[in-house]
């Protein structure tokens, strides 16, 4: 077994292979979990996971790993963590890990050196005290001593609150602000590419629309604020944490428009029949499955989701070669604007 598919996952489990830690008979909770060959190499009795990103959650389910239930009071002798790169989100996840520990339990984490491993290690040490450590696969692995309780409950509570959705003031957003949280794409600002797309939307849109990769809902709020003849709008988003924010941001429109919120992997396709689709597609994925092909998959999903004659409105990094994919799935592909390193395109579904 090699570590090329997910070095951090392989590194995370190394202490059990090396005899540095024992796997608890009562099982473990895995926060930020990802599937990979390291999890298939041997049994991990009682392992359950939580993962808010849909394609990563789907991969864990396909591999046969059990999702954690919703029981908030369950406590674990071991909590595994693959912290995200965004520091506030990672701190919140560490605080959640400590809160989920049974008395005498440990937190074990790993992160790539190139993705903030030293900062993550320092943060867990600040929260939980001295750590055991090792280096493997260009990653840092670090774990707490057995903990009777969080050593610094005040800091743990402060960091746990970092994950709470909060109001962000921004005059470009509908109503002068929006609800978001750390770790969501462009969590504390209106993304420049999305703002460029909004500036070049047409004078009229109507009927059923969708946003593929909706994030916290900026494009959706702008569309619904501008176009009273839109009757239904669906938001498709892979990150459940972002989708929860979008639900709050779309509340002002809920009585006028039929809204749908879908925790969904757009790359696998979406239902059809839309009159228009707006999209600021990701050009990379999460974790070891990151790939430039993801944006192209979004364009193919949009082509299949639109009724014949339906229109796509797209913004993307200027250098990304999406023209061939657009030409394959659409007619009348046009570039509406180029600015700030981005391009806005529109295309008509065949």
Residue ranges and their predicted role:
Residues 4-63, 192-279:
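Conserved SAM/SAH cofactor-binding pocket of Class I
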Residues 49, 109, 235, 314, ...:
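Conserved SAM-binding loop
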Residues 77-88, 212-216, 274-287:
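Conserved proline-anchored active-site loop of SAM-dependent methyltransferases
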Residues 91-103, 296-308:
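A short glycine-rich, Lys/Arg-flanked "PGG" loop and its adjoining helix->strand segment in the class I
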Residues 104-113, 309-316:
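Conserved beta-strand signature within the Rossmann-like core of class I S-adenosyl-L-methionine
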Residues 129-166, 317-350:
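Class I S-adenosyl-L-methionine
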Residues 135-208:
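SAM-dependent Rossmann-like transferase core, predominantly class I methyltransferases
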Residues 240, 276-303:
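Mobile active-site "lid"/loop adjacent to the S-adenosyl-L-methionine
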């Amino acid at each position: 077994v090699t570590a090329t598919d997910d070095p951090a996952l392989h590194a995370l489990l190394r202490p059990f292979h090396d005899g540095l830690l024992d796997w608890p008979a009562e099982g473990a909770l895995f926060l930020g979990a990802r599937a990979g060959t390291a999890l298939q190499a041997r049994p991990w009795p009682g392992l359950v996971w939580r993962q808010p990103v849909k394609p990563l959650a789907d991969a864990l389910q396909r591999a046969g790993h059990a999702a954690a239930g919703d029981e908030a009071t369950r406590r674990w002798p071991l909590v595994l963590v693959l912290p995200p790169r965004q520091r506030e989100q990672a701190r919140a996840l560490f605080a959640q890990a400590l809160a989920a520990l049974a008395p005498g339990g440990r937190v074990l984490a790993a992160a790539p050196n190139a993705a903030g491993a030293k900062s993550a290690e320092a943060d867990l040490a600040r929260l939980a005290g001295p750590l055991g450590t090792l280096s493997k696969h260009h990653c840092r692995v670090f774990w707490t001593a057995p903990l009777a309780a969080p050593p610094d409950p005040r800091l743990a509570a402060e960091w746990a609150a970092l994950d709470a959705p909060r109001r962000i003031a921004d005059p470009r957003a509908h109503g002068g602000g929006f609800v978001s949280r750390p770790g969501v794409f462009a969590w504390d600002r209106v993304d420049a590419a999305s703002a460029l797309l909004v500036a070049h939307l047409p004078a009229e849109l109507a009927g059923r629309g969708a946003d593929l990769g909706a994030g916290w809902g900026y494009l959706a709020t702008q569309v619904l604020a501008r176009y009273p003849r839109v009757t239904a709008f669906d938001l498709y988003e892979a990150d459940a944490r972002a989708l929860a924010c979008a639900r709050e941001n779309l509340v002002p429109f809920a009585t006028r428009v039929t809204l749908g919120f879908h925790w969904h992997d757009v790359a696998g396709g979406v239902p059809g029949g839309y009159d228009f689709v707006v999209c600021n597609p990701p050009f990379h994925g999460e974790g070891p499955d990151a790939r430039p092909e993801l944006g192209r998959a979004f364009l193919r999903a949009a082509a299949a989701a639109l009724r014949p004659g339906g229109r796509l409105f797209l913004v993307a990094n200027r250098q990304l070669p999406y023209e061939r994919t657009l030409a394959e799935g659409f007619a009348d592909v046009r570039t509406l604007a180029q600015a700030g390193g981005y391009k806005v395109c529109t295309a008509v579904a065949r």
